[in-house]
């Protein structure tokens, strides 16, 4: 999760899939740590932001009657940490909410989504929130 409006609908979708398949949801927020800092640096503002986002996601999942585990990770780059954690935990599916972003007037998914799509050890579903 990244704190975008797409996260809420993605979690609702994940809850529907988890209930149907008797699965469990694991939501992760990755704090990207600059190379000038130690990887375990306590960046209070980012930690607070991540915890708030995860608390909100947890509330949504609980309202849906879903079992959810949340985790706050710190890494130099979010994409490899998502893939590595998925492999380590043996997840069956990665579901990512994607917001509409443009670069040079063209739709872009940024750097994280393409990396996860290419390197994930499991299936990946992208949820794109409709443009209002």
Spans of model-derived segments:
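Small/aliphatic-rich secondary-structure junction motif
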Residues: 1-44, 60-69, 119
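Short glycine-rich, flexible loops that bind phosphorylated cofactors or substrates
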Residues: 6, 78, 102-104
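Active-site phosphate/pyrophosphate- and oxyanion-stabilizing loops and adjacent acidic/basic residues
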Residues: 15, 83, 114
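Structural beta-sheet core signal
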Residues: 27-29, 96, 126
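A short acidic, glycine-rich active-site loop
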Residues: 42-52
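Structural beta-alpha unit
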Residues: 62-94, 131-132
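Glycine-rich, Arg-bearing micro-motifs that act as flexible, cationic patches
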Residues: 96-119, 129
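Short, flexible loop segments at boundaries between secondary-structure elements
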Residues: 122-132
């Amino acid at each position: 999760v990244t704190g975008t409006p797409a996260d809420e609908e993605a979690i609702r979708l994940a809850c529907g899939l988890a209930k149907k398949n008797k699965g469990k949801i694991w939501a992760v927020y990755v704090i990207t740590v600059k190379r000038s800092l130690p990887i375990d640096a306590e960046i209070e503002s980012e930690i607070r932001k991540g915890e708030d986002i995860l608390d909100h996601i947890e509330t949504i999942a609980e309202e849906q009657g879903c079992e959810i585990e949340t985790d706050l990770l710190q890494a130099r780059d979010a994409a490899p940490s998502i893939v590595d954690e998925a492999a380590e935990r043996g997840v069956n599916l990665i579901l990512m909410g994607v917001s509409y972003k443009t670069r040079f007037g063209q739709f872009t998914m940024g750097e994280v989504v393409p990396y996860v799509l290419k390197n994930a050890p499991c299936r990946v579903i992208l949820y794109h929130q409709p443009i209002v």
